[in-house]
């Protein structure tokens, strides 16, 4: 195995929605194991926001169980971002995670500056990256 230190940065919401849109099932453990065959994974950062329990208790419970499961993965860090209510043009209400890409980019730059890793892997479905 190569001694290069790898940090993985995951844009949770965008990844989730794109995997769902294309009906792709994956486990984070499998992704990490694949990278670990050639590199040392030192940290995994997952950027998301907690769903509003009062809006949809079922989705909230599913999301919470998912977060509880992935935070048991060694060196896995959940970074909580802001959830904002958005009024759509038709008057309906939706919710959007705000600031996740800013948190991710800031952590990426800070970690590179502090020499915390040699390689950064960004996992996202966001066109911003």
Residue ranges and their predicted role:
Residues 72-129:
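Nuclease catalytic cores that cleave nucleic-acid phosphodiester bonds
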Residues 1-96:
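Domain-level signal for Mg2+-assisted phosphodiester chemistry and nucleotide/NA-binding surfaces
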């Amino acid at each position: 195995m190569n001694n290069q230190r790898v940090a993985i940065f995951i844009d949770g919401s965008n990844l989730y929605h794109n995997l769902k849109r294309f009906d792709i099932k994956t486990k984070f453990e499998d992704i990490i194991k694949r990278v670990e065959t050639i590199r040392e994974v030192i940290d995994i950062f997952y950027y998301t926001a907690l769903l509003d329990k009062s809006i949809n208790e079922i989705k909230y419970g599913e999301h919470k169980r998912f977060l509880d499961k992935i935070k048991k993965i060694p060196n896995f860090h959940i970074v909580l971002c802001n959830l904002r209510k958005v009024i759509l043009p038709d008057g309906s209400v939706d919710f959007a995670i705000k600031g996740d890409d800013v948190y991710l980019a800031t952590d990426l730059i800070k970690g590179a500056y502090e020499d915390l890793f040699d390689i950064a892997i960004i996992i996202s479905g966001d066109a911003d990256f």
